[in-house]
């Protein structure tokens, strides 16, 4: 067992201040603002009432974001001018858990427990769902040499948390946003006139930033490599075409070129695509379509 505190959020590099901001805004939403109240709990439960509660998995899966319980309850305690809860984590983020397994235990003011219950569960169920779904893809790719990547198809304002959950599930993060990596896509190529023109424009304006290029044909892939790109996103290619593209690129340069496949991938066929020799397969569904992992908070 370990204390569940904010240090747990640093294990895989999550920005704790970002997480605190998400929690603050989520509680403001649920309570009607920073000075709002839970009208039911405040009317029925004295601040001096103390209880213990357990976070329990209602389905098997992979856990992510357990420390958010501590962040939520700390924020609630501050709002209520109440003592903080004592919280213990019984499993670590990234762990596979069974239905019925107790994941964490908390003791302290009952009001704090109940006011923060739904906000914390909403966040942790969501992140654990992303981690669980990602683990399915990571397991499907095991031994192929390919890694599963996430995308920018995330819930607004939850990107850092959801990308953390992807890592907990064994996935790899791609770019965080529009600022850290350049991605030349079809509309950029159309606006600039060609793959090379678009690549050269970005490289000229931002000489130190990585420039990735989306391609749909072997010819585009070779043009991008000739322009200087060392990361290709092969969009909506069939497995045979993806394999042909990988072979052509590997034969065209001795430089290391990372190749990603995306579009229309399914768990049933992912190993077929991995066998083409790609480095990555990106799956938007990791963050835009993952069902939650059902968790509950039970008073004991």
Regions found by a protein language model. Give the residues of each.
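Acidic/glycine-rich phosphate/pyrophosphate-binding loops and surrounding catalytic core
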Residues: 2-227, 243-248, 258-260, 271-280, ...
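Conserved structured catalytic cores and adjacent interaction surfaces
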Residues: 220, 224-241, 265
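Residue-level signal for the nucleotide or nucleotide-sugar donor/cofactor binding architecture
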Residues: 268
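Glycine-rich beta-strand-to-loop/alpha-helix junction loops that act as flexible
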Residues: 234-235, 259-265, 283-285
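Conserved phosphotransfer cores of two-component systems
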Residues: 253
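Active-site loop ensemble at the mouth of alpha/beta enzyme cores that anchors a bound cofactor
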Residues: 296-300
């Amino acid at each position: 067992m370990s204390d569940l505190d904010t240090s747990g959020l640093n294990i895989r590099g999550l920005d704790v201040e970002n997480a605190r901001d998400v929690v603050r805004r989520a509680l403001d939403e649920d309570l009607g603002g920073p000075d709002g109240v839970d009208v039911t709990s405040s009317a029925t439960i004295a601040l001096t009432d103390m209880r213990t509660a357990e976070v329990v998995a209602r389905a098997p899966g992979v856990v992510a974001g357990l420390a958010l319980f501590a962040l939520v309850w700390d924020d609630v305690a501050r709002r209520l001018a109440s003592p903080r809860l004592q919280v213990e984590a019984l499993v670590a983020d990234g762990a596979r858990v069974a239905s019925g397994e107790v994941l964490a235990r908390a003791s302290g003011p009952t009001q704090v427990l109940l006011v923060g219950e739904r906000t914390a569960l909403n966040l942790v169920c969501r992140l654990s769902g992303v981690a669980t779904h990602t683990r399915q893809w990571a397991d499907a790719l095991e031994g192929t040499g390919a890694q599963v990547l996430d995308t920018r198809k995330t819930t607004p304002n939850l990107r850092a948390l959801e990308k953390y959950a992807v890592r907990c599930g064994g996935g790899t993060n791609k770019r965080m946003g529009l600022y850290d990596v350049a991605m030349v896509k079809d509309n950029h190529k159309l606006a600039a006139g060609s793959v090379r023109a678009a690549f050269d424009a970005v490289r000229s304006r931002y000489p130190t930033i990585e420039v990735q290029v989306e391609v749909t044909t072997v010819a585009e892939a070779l043009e991008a490599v000739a322009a200087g790109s060392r990361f290709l996103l092969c969009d909506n290619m069939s497995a045979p075409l993806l394999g042909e593209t990988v072979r052509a690129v590997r034969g065209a340069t001795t430089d290391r070129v990372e190749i990603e496949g995306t579009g229309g991938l399914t768990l049933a066929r992912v190993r077929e695509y991995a066998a083409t020799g790609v480095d990555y397969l990106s799956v938007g569904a990791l963050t835009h379509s993952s069902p939650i992992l059902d968790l509950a908070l039970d008073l004991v």
